[in-house]
């Protein structure tokens, strides 16, 4: 293939002088030439560069600008179109507005939800910071739903308890009706506009710029509007590029969720962590994949099978429909397998909201009522919604510590910090979610760790610090690869390779997995990667070339998919979202460790690093592993 990693070897390119009429005044432009084309390359220098403008990227950019850092935010789509906008249910924080609460109880639930694969120092940091993060959002102007006495309304959510699991259901999820992500994204974008962050909208980040010592010096990106290439030099680069849900055929993710940051890191020779843990949300609309928030069950919604039975009472006697997501998804899948599915093909389940008062639906779940009417054709006040477990979230990603700094294995040190590189949000793996994320912890994750990245930069750097110059050849290999890809003349269109990859992932790395399906999946996903060598691009232009962009995104997805499948095949246990039918028990002795997947010479190499069982300080003791029952 044209590129296996950033260090791919290509002949040196001739360089000439040139300028770009669209380049900012402060940027220097020149031409890079390949055998077939010349490319305008514009150089920029910033204290910090954020890649991605969803919740994590915006919160990082806001923090950096507040600390006085000259900050650029690169995003492939307009900030308010980022996938954070699709988050519905809410954001967890132990505010105690509905019942007594404590961040330590929240931490216990998160550790238990992670099936003891989460790093307890990072989880402590997130849960302790949560109330502060929510109050900060309120001060920014986020229009939270309210109780009658004016406090932020908090609803019940899955896997949440009081008093370390002994005190019943917690009401911890602060929400803005069922459009919390939408409210958050617009609120954060408004805040970012107040500060001096420079946005580069519709710029597609292609690769990290790494020096010979393994320090990240920035990124190279394509301006999709005019076809110019841009090298962003920065002391600190923060990746907030989201997940890779579109590697699957049916997903709640937007079509833009293609794991771009993950793939950039993998090509730079750094590992991706715990990619085998893919969350299936229990309630995607049957046939459409659109999300029905867990908040619908938090407000009293009930799952029923073809016999009208509330079957979750059998699988999770205490939590019932509000067990954690992996438990509910597996339970639904088992009901369908055993012939108790609904519909003509008996291949889905009903979510009943029709017993709830219409005023509750109107006030607390207005978006769900609308979504169900459009995509399922049902009136939720009278009929159940047809639902099916659907790919929703990637627990794995770029390994980081609780400061947001990217870490890698270096000699005997499993926590070696990669200088100049950070990550936050779904792209990162801190790991606060471990093997299974609790609902409403993702919006918390993005604001807490977006802010943590900015604070860490403020601790370790000063605005305006002198930077090491880029090598003249920095980014040349990426440009040569882009040129080759743009002129690719194989026999397979991007859409055909992508569909094949999505079907392999859907069939072979699903809710339940076996050695047979995973071994077959490894072979098939490798073939899908090999077929990418034969891709055909019809549009040769550089301006608004969706064919080219989708092909780059496909490469990024394929890298994520290959590492996911191989990591899943290697893990011989069931833990959280990784459910093996041939290894049905959790094996703490052999497998309480993080998987690391390296992308080397177009093949996956696996390694492992320990889970952090330690807490940050004496405020809370670590929670030892025990059976996970809801």
Swiss-Prot record:
Mode of membrane association: Peripheral membrane protein
Organelle transit peptide: 1-31
Entry annotated with the keyword Cytoplasm: no
Keyword Mitochondrion on entry: yes
GO CC, one annotated term: respiratory chain complex II (succinate dehydrogenase)
Subcellular location: Mitochondrion inner membrane
Keyword annotations from UniProtKB, A to Z: Electron transport, FAD, Flavoprotein, Membrane, Mitochondrion, Mitochondrion inner membrane, Oxidoreductase, Transit peptide, Transport, Tricarboxylic acid cycle
GO molecular function, one term: succinate dehydrogenase (quinone) activity
Classification via PROSITE patterns: FRD_SDH_FAD_BINDING
NCBIfam families referenced in this protein's UniProt entry, alphabetically: sdhA_forward, sdhA_frdA_Gneg
Role of this protein: Flavoprotein (FP) subunit of succinate dehydrogenase (SDH) that is involved in complex II of the mitochondrial electron transport chain and is responsible for transferring electrons from succinate to ubiquinone (coenzyme Q).
Family: Belongs to the FAD-dependent oxidoreductase 2 family. FRD/SDH subfamily.
Protein name (Swiss-Prot/TrEMBL): Succinate dehydrogenase [ubiquinone] flavoprotein subunit, mitochondrial
């Amino acid at each position: 293939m044209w590129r296996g990693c950033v260090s791919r070897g290509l002949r040196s390119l001739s360089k000439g002088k040139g300028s770009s009429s669209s380049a900012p005044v402060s940027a220097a432009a020149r031409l890079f030439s390949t055998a077939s084309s010349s490319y305008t390359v514009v150089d920029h220098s910033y204290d910090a560069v954020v890649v991605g403008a969803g919740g994590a990227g915006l919160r990082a950019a806001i923090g950096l600008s507040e600390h006085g850092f000259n900050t650029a935010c690169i995003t492939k789509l307009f900030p308010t179109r980022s996938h954070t906008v699709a988050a519905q249910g809410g954001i967890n924080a132990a505010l105690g507005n509905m019942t007594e609460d404590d961040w330590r109880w929240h931490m216990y639930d998160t550790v238990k939800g992670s099936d003891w694969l989460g790093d307890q120092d990072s989880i402590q940091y997130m849960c302790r910071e949560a109330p502060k993060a929510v109050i900060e959002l309120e001060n920014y102007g986020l229009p939270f739903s309210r109780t009658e006495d004016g406090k932020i309304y908090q609803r019940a959510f899955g896997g949440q308890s009081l008093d370390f699991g002994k005190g019943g259901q917690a009401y911890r999820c602060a929400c803005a009706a069922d459009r919390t992500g939408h409210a958050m994204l617009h609120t954060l974008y408004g805040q970012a506009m107040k500060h001096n962050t420079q946005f580069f909208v519709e710029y597609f980040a292609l690769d990290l710029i790494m020096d010979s010592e393994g320090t990240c010096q920035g990124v190279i990106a394509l301006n999709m509007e005019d076809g110019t290439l841009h090298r962003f030099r920065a002391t600190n680069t923060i990746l907030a590029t989201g997940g890779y849900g579109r590697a699957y055929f049916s997903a709640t993710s937007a079509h833009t969720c293609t794991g771009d940051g993950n793939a950039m890191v993998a090509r730079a020779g750094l590992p991706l962590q715990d990619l085998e843990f893919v969350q299936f949300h229990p309630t995607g609309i049957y046939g459409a994949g659109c999300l029905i928030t867990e908040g619908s069950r938090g407000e009293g919604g009930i799952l029923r099978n073809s016999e009208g039975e509330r079957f979750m009472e059998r699988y999770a006697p205490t939590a019932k429909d509000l067990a954690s997501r992996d438990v509910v998804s597996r339970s639904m899948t088992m009901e369908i397998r055993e012939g108790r599915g609904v519909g003509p093909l008996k291949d889905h389940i009903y979510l009943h909201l029709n017993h709830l008062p219409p005023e509750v639906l109107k006030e607390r779940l207005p978006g769900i009522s609308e979504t169900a009417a459009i995509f399922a054709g049902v009136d939720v006040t009278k009929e159940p919604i047809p639902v099916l477990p659907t790919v929703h979230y990637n627990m794995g990603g770029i390994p980081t510590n609780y400061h947001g700094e990217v870490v890698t294995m270096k000699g005997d040190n499993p926590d070696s910090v990669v200088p100049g590189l950070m990550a936050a949000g779904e792209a990162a793996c801190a790991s606060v979610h471990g093997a299974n994320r609790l609902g409403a912890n993702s919006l918390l994750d993005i604001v807490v760790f977006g802010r943590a990245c900015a604070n860490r930069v403020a601790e370790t750097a000063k605005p305006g610090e002198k930077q090491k110059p880029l090598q003249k050849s920095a980014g040349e290999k990426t440009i040569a690869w882009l040129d080759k890809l743009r002129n690719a003349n194989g026999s397979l269109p991007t859409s055909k390779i992508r569909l094949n990859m999505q079907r392999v992932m859907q069939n072979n790395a699903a809710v339940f997995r076996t050695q047979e399906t995973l071994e077959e999946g490894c072979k098939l996903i490798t073939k899908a990667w090999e077929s990418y060598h034969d891709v055909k691009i019809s549009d040769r232009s550089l301006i608004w070339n969706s064919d080219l962009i989708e092909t780059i995104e496909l490469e990024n997805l394929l890298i994520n998919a290959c590492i996911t499948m191989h990591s899943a095949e290697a893990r011989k246990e069931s833990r959280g979202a990784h459910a093996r039918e041939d290894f049905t028990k959790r094996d703490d002795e052999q497998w309480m460790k993080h998987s690391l997947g390296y992308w080397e010479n177009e093949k996956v190499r696996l390694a492992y690093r320990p889970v952090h069982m330690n807490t940050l300080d004496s405020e809370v003791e670590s929670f030892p592993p025990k059976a996970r029952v809801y």
